[in-house]
C-alpha cells in the first residue's frame, strides 16, 4: 500500500523513539497510521469510514483481511478490516426493538438500516459512518494511540432509530506489538441505555491455505440458532475439537461462557492471530465461510437480537448504562510468527 503524506504530518516524538503516529492520504482517503518500530507493526485507521481499522501490518503482512484497495472501499463500502457495529451488532428479528419495557420502531425509509439475506435489520447504523472526528493523537515511550468520537445525540436520523442520547469514543492503542481497541459509551439520556455493540474483524494468516488453518474456540457454551440465525435461548456445551481444522468446515456460530481473558486464535504453519476479549465482551461470534481466506472472531457485548430476547425473558445478561454513566471495554489483537 502506498502512503502519501499530506500537509499535516504529525511526528509526535523524536525519530529515535519506538512509537510514532502520522496522518496521511491513501487512495484519496485520509488515514491515521500508528507505528511500533520495535515490533515492525503498522496500523492504519480510517475515521471517515466508520473509524475502520483497515490494516495491521506485521513485517509487511496484513493481519486483517481487507478485500479491496481503500479507494474502492470508499466508493463501494463492504465489510473488511475491523468494522464497528452499533447500536446493535448482528441481527434483530423485526423492524423494532424493546428497551426498558418500551417498543421502538425502526424507520426504514431513512435509509440507514441494513438488512441481511432474510430482510432482517443487521449490524446497526454506523458501520461506514463518516461522522467520526479525531479528538486525540498521542505517542510516547509506552504506546501510539488515536481517539475518535461520534456524538450520536447530534444526528436526528440516528436518534430516530435509537433514541438514547449518547457519545461514543474509540481508541486504537498500539503497544508491545499488540493492538488494543477500547470503546466507551457515555449515556446522556434520562433512562438506562441497553448495550449490544460489537466488532466484526476479519483476519487471515499467509503461510498456509485455509484448509490448513487451525482454530481455538475459547468458550464453553454454543448457542443454538434458528434458521434465521437468531438464538433460540437453548445453549449446549461446545463439542468442537481443540483446535478445529477449517478443512471442510464452515463456521457462523455464536458462543458464550467465555474463558477468563478469552483468547480465540487462528494459526497456519507458524503465523498466528489472537483476539483477547475484555470481560464485558461476553459473547463471541465466529464466522469462517468456506471458499474465503478469512476468519472473523467477533467481540460482542450481547447475543444476536439481544434487545428483543431480553424483553421476552430469554436473555438475562443484557448490559445497561445508567443515566450519566459510562460503559467501557477493550479487546486486543496480537500476532506471532509473522
Regions found by a protein language model. Give the residues of each.
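Acidic/His-leaning functional-site neighborhoods
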Residues: 38, 59, 118-137, 214, ...
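Active-site/ligand-binding surface loops and adjacent short beta/alpha elements
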Residues: 111, 192-194, 202-278
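Intrinsically disordered, low-complexity Pro/Gly/Ser/Thr-rich segments with frequent PxxP/GP/PP motifs
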Residues: 314-327
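Acidic, contiguous internal or C-terminal segments within carbohydrate-active enzymes
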Residues: 34-36, 46-47, 56-58, 150-206
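Sec-dependent N-terminal signal peptides
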Residues: 3-13
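Beta-strand-rich N-terminal accessory domains
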Residues: 17-112, 260-281, 325-338
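Extended, loop-rich substrate-binding clefts of extracytoplasmic carbohydrate-active enzymes
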Residues: 18-27, 102, 107-176
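Short, conserved secondary-structure segments in the cores of folded domains
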Residues: 93-94, 158, 317
Amino acid at each position: 500500500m502506498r502512503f502519501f503524506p499530506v500537509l499535516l504530518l504529525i511526528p509526535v516524538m523524536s525519530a529515535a523513539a519506538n512509537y510514532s503516529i502520522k496522518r496521511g492520504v491513501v487512495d484519496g482517503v485520509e488515514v491515521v497510521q500508528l507505528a511500533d518500530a520495535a515490533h515492525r507493526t503498522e496500523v492504519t485507521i480510517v475515521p471517515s469510514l466508520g473509524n475502520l481499522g483497515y490494516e495491521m501490518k506485521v513485517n509487511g503482512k496484513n493481519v486483517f483481511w481487507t478485500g479491496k484497495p481503500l479507494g474502492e472501499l470508499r466508493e463501494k463500502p463492504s465489510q473488511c478490516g475491523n468494522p464497528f457495529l452499533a447500536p446493535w451488532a448482528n441481527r434483530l428479528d423485526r423492524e423494532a426493538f424493546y428497551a426498558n419495557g418500551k417498543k421502538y420502531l425502526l424507520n426504514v425509509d431513512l435509509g440507514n438500516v441494513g438488512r441481511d439475506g432474510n430482510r432482517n435489520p443487521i449490524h446497526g447504523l454506523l458501520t461506514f459512518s463518516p461522522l467520526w472526528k479525531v479528538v486525540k493523537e498521542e505517542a510516547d515511550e509506552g504506546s501510539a494511540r488515536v481517539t475518535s468520537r461520534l456524538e450520536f445525540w447530534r444526528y436526528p436520523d440516528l436518534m430516530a432509530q435509537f433514541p438514547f442520547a449518547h457519545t461514543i469514543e474509540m481508541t486504537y492503542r498500539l503497544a508491545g506489538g499488540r493492538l488494543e481497541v477500547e470503546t466507551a459509551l457515555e449515556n446522556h439520556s434520562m433512562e438506562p441505555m441497553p448495550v449490544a455493540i460489537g466488532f466484526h474483524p476479519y483476519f487471515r494468516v499467509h503461510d498456509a491455505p485455509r484448509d490448513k488453518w487451525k482454530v481455538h474456540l475459547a468458550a464453553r457454551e454454543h448457542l443454538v440458532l434458528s434458521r434465521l440465525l437468531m438464538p433460540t435461548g437453548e445453549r449446549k456445551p461446545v463439542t468442537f475439537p481443540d483446535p478445529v481444522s477449517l478443512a471442510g468446515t464452515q463456521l457462523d456460530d455464536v458462543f458464550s461462557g467465555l474463558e477468563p481473558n478469552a483468547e480465540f486464535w487462528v494459526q497456519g504453519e507458524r503465523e498466528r492471530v489472537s483476539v483477547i476479549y475484555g470481560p464485558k465482551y461476553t459473547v463471541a461470534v465466529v464466522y469462517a465461510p468456506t471458499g474465503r481466506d478469512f476468519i472473523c472472531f467477533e467481540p460482542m457485548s450481547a447475543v444476536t437480537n439481544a434487545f428483543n430476547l431480553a424483553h421476552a425473558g430469554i436473555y438475562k445478561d443484557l448490559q445497561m448504562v445508567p443515566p450519566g454513566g459510562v460503559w467501557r471495554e477493550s479487546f486486543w489483537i496480537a500476532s506471532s510468527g509473522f
